[in-house]
Amino acid sequence: METSKRNISFGRSIYINLGEQVVTQVLEEMKAVRQTVAFTSFQLPEHPLEISDMARLVELARSYEVDLIPDIAHKDLTKENIAALKKAGLSYLRLDEFGDEAFIERCGKAFTLVVNASTFTHREYKLLERLGFSRQIIACHNYYPKVYSGISLEKFTTINQKLHALGVKVLAFIPGDEPLRGPLHEGLPTVETHRTLDTRLAICAHPVGTQC
């Protein structure tokens, strides 16, 4: 899938609270198999982050030729922080919620926007279209830590069909393998029926893989 910089097919998730040694190991593994994009979250209640922490992780990932797609709290996306993350080399930004038009325009000029596939509305799409960002956006589903909280395959397919009709590329999550992220350690899938599947089987079972 072509974006502004990368061809995304498969990626990984990395989390700064796992420690730099674990993060570096994952990045080394990604570089070895030419994976170029990783999801991360900068919204970690158990591990509050400063903008300098976020920028350092972006720079570390870039040193392994990996671009991050970070989930960042709206309050942390000040003009100064956007500039700092852009300077560190950040290319993508996941927006869980839309702010006002000026905020969206500021973010869209700095980064390729990654919207929440589950909540993205046609009105939001038209706003991005008017601002000139609709051709470069990506939609990313949520992952669901709790057993039975993931969405059904039917809902997943319906959402994807609507997004594909708009020309929007879609990303989603498979459960992952060891070490599973805490505190529940139940995997982080988008589709509930994928939760107990082996990683390779989950990849093969994922309809997104044949449509993006």
Regions found by a protein language model. Name each.
Residues R6-V23, L68-L77, H185-T196:
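Active-site mouth loops of central-metabolism enzymes
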Residues L27-R34, S52-E65, A83-G89, I104-A110, ...:
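Acidic (Asp/Glu)-rich catalytic clusters
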Residues N17-K31, L77-L85, Y125, T199-I203:
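Short, acidic/polar
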Residues T36-R56:
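Glycine-rich, proline-tolerant flexible connector loops at the mouths of alpha/beta enzymes
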Residues L18-Q21, A73-L77, D96-E101, A117-R123:
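Short beta->alpha connector loops
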Residues R6-I16, V37-T40, V66-A73, S91-L95, ...:
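Hydrophobic faces of well-ordered beta-strands that scaffold small-molecule active sites
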Residues L44-P48, H74-L77, T121-H122, P145-Y148:
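Short, small-residue-enriched loops and turns at beta-alpha junctions
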Residues N116-C212:
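Catalytic alpha/beta core domains of metabolic enzymes, predominantly
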